[in-house]
């Protein structure tokens, strides 16, 4: 087995370092797994990951979000709570963020080169502004509002 030193490997190593420096384990783990895949016999699975990775990730994320409801740690509100203005606002924000995410998936599909900038921006926001890595999909969706074309 010989290691491949190319621009993609360099990008992945850079993302790993930024993830470590920015205390962003999601970026660190993801870039490490992809680097290991690229450098080993697992490279044959990269097309599968490319094709289905976002959908699988969204499924896992949805399971994580719904788990506290299923476990009983988060109680469902009664019907009267659903008509409170804060609940309406929460639902509206949820719809807006889901829409941003959809636009983000489209933008990343049509302009994948922007993903690096989105990741670096997310890492910088976590490292220096006390932010939380909520995800490149939402960032890409917001970016699509500024640059247009989503596919």
Curated annotation (Swiss-Prot):
<keyword id="KW-1003">Cell membrane</keyword>
<keyword id="KW-1133">Transmembrane helix</keyword>
<feature type="transmembrane region" description="Helical">
    <location>
        <begin position="52"/>
        <end position="72"/>
    </location>
</feature>
<dbReference type="Pfam" id="PF04284">
    <property type="entry name" value="DUF441"/>
</dbReference>
<protein>
    <recommendedName>
        <fullName>UPF0756 membrane protein HS_0993</fullName>
    </recommendedName>
</protein>
<comment type="similarity">
    <text>Belongs to the UPF0756 family.</text>
</comment>
<feature type="transmembrane region" description="Helical">
    <location>
        <begin position="1"/>
        <end position="21"/>
    </location>
</feature>
<dbReference type="GO" id="GO:0005886">
    <property type="term" value="C:plasma membrane"/>
</dbReference>
<keyword id="KW-0472">Membrane</keyword>
<feature type="transmembrane region" description="Helical">
    <location>
        <begin position="123"/>
        <end position="143"/>
    </location>
</feature>
<keyword id="KW-0812">Transmembrane</keyword>
<dbReference type="InterPro" id="IPR007382">
    <property type="entry name" value="UPF0756_TM"/>
</dbReference>
<feature type="transmembrane region" description="Helical">
    <location>
        <begin position="81"/>
        <end position="101"/>
    </location>
</feature>
